[in-house]
Amino acid sequence: MTSLSADKVERLGFYNLQELLEDDNLTYKIIRSCVSLNSAITEITKEDHPELSKSFFETANYLYPFGILTLSKIKKMNYKDVEKEYMDKVSSQTADYMHFMKENGVTNQSFIKGTFIGDDLNFCNEIRSAIEITISETNKLKSKN
């Protein structure tokens, strides 16, 4: 990992879902990172592997609004300002992930091999699943009332 990437691309798998529930700042950071990571992989794979790319795109798009909601809860700003700040941070972090993965591709002939990216993708998928389950269970409770 270069010093540029080391500062901007951080392993997400050190955290657990319970920690996310207890800390809005951490929740925001992780969701933003998951959106950025999935966006970066979407960009890197879309030409050679369009079907694979689509699944990363779907995860990024699914998580995207939850990052905005979490940031608006933290910052208590109007929606347009929060959305702009979030979009700027995601774009910047996506570029950082792409740079990191391309550097790794040169070193290891793989964008992911020899890194924590695969583990982080699994962690991001766990977060998406937890959100989906929570929404599903909430809807079930609402329909019973």
Regions found by a protein language model. Give the residues of each.
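Extended hydrophobic/Leu-rich segments
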Residues: V9, I31-C34, N38, V82, ...
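Short N-proximal segments of mature Sec-exported proteins
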Residues: L20-M77
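Short N-terminal segments immediately surrounding and downstream of signal-peptide cleavage
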Residues: M1-N25
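Generic signal for short, ordered secondary-structure residues
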Residues: G13-F14, K46, K102-E103
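Compact alpha-helical subdomains of small soluble proteins
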Residues: Y64-N145
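Alpha-helical protein-protein interaction elements
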Residues: A6-D7, D48, N78, K89
